């Protein structure tokens, strides 16, 4: 009696490479359901290979540092929240474990909410160290968003349980006594920065969702502080909050 298509589909999931799939006896099974299952599994493996190739490419900066110092503690740093009209700027500093692999990890802006949440859970359970840093709305208004972002990055680094030996920073240079590499669009080039990007994004989004429950009417849970029409309508109807950045337009014009 021939195997059922259901059984074959189950076995195909245990084939972990395209070459293994190509050697499979099921290539000779003429049943349409089997051939469709083969095509589907090939597409899955091709997608997984693309993700793996991208992940390997995003470890190049880390591997270069480790080649010179195998004991290096490499810390990726990124921020989220420079552009919104409300809420703090949040940063994250992350040191990954040596044998890390987080399939699909990328710049948080390129991931869906579901993908970010899944990767966040994996990161929080399997990183060497991480810490968040914040700069408040008051600090943003006092020293400007660029300086406030650097301040928040310093706070994240200081919050780590161990001092890193090399920093990979997204598009900034920090005044700190630790060797560093600044990478433009680093969250798409370095797994360490990408990890920091995801954690910072998820952390700040949760903060803004909590703020949305505290101040209904501004749609913070949807706009995370950005100047959407719903947010602007909320300002017109309910007024400006302490959580609004007074040096950002149109808030600035409304308070003067």
Curated annotation (Swiss-Prot):
Q: What is its EC number?
A: 3.1.26.4
Keyword set, alphabetical order = Cytoplasm, Endonuclease, Hydrolase, Manganese, Metal-binding, Nuclease
Q: Where in the cell is it found?
A: Cytoplasm
Q: Which GO terms describe its biological process?
A: DNA replication, removal of RNA primer; mismatch repair
Q: Where does a divalent metal cation bind?
A: 78-79, 170
SUPFAM superfamilies listed in its UniProt record: Ribonuclease H-like
Xref: PROSITE patterns: RNASE_H_2
Show which residues constitute the signal peptide: none
What GO cellular-component annotations does this UniProt entry give?
A: cytoplasm; ribonuclease H2 complex
The answer on whether this UniProt entry bears the keyword Oxidoreductase reads no
According to the record, how does the cofactor bind? Manganese or magnesium. Binds 1 divalent metal ion per monomer in the absence of substrate. May bind a second metal ion after substrate binding.
Please provide an example of a Pfam family that matches this protein in its UniProt record.
RNase_HII
Predominant localisation class: cytoplasm
Instruction: Report which residue ranges the record marks as coiled coil.
Output: none
Q: Catalyses which reaction?
A: Endonucleolytic cleavage to 5'-phosphomonoester
Instruction: Please give the start and end residues of each transmembrane region.
Output: none
> Which cofactors must be present for this protein to function?
Mn(2+); Mg(2+)
**An MF annotation (GO) of this entry:** manganese ion binding
Domain RNase H type-2 per the UniProt entry, residue ranges: 72-256
Family statement drawn from the similarity comment of this UniProt entry: Belongs to the RNase HII family.
User: Briefly, what is this protein's role?
Assistant: Endonuclease that specifically degrades the RNA of RNA-DNA hybrids.
Protein name (record): Ribonuclease HII
Q: From which organism does this entry originate? A: Staphylococcus saprophyticus subsp. saprophyticus (strain ATCC 15305 / DSM 20229 / NCIMB 8711 / NCTC 7292 / S-41)
The upper taxonomy is:
Bacteria, Bacillati, Bacillota, Bacilli, Bacillales
Gene name on record?
A: rnhB
